[in-house]
Amino acid sequence: MPNLAEHYQLSEQDYLAGEPDSPIKHEYIDGEVYAMAGASANHNLITGNIHGELRTHLKGKPCRPFASDMKVKIGSRYFYPDVLVDCAEYAGDDQFTETPTLIVEVLSKSTRRMDETVKRSSYSQIDSLQEYLLIEQDIVDVELVRRSNGWRSEHFFMGDQFTLESVGLTLSVSEIYDRVKNADVTDWLLQQAAQAEADAAASMTAATHAAATDQP
């Protein structure tokens, strides 16, 4: 996630030359270099959950999933999406891709504005991009925008499922938020536990009633 308070000017050539050896990742936006801030536990869990599902689903297929360390080049801009999938023939460049099919960003208070404005506008200019997935980490809210839907937003919440048409993968929101800790996840887990307890009690009552009915 870019730290907007820590940025400076640099040529595109110098940025590309220095980035591989830098201990801190940087995004590059029209001549300005922005240092990437560290990510929270929830951010890392969500990124890992999404990447894990994609990696399993795409194993043995042409499309390749990447997490966090592969840059996307759009004109004179370079971003590090949290997760991306590239289905184009591998060109051998290990620094960036220009042909992502799917991009995923995990949002936070410090990155939401960038992810929903600058990055959304930039990503929509990528001819190969079919879907952009934005995932909140502090609440449960999954936003999916598709090229085929005119980049209009669809939102999904706990209990919902949706399909990433670009890669043919159906995900549940609960899979995305597995082991994530926020108030929405906690409330949903409590509701699920209460429902399971109620169902078990109802089953026991039904079984007891059936046994009593069967007695002569």
Placement of each model-derived feature along the sequence:
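Gly/Pro/Ser/Thr-rich low-complexity, intrinsically disordered segments predominantly at protein N-termini
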Residues: 1-216
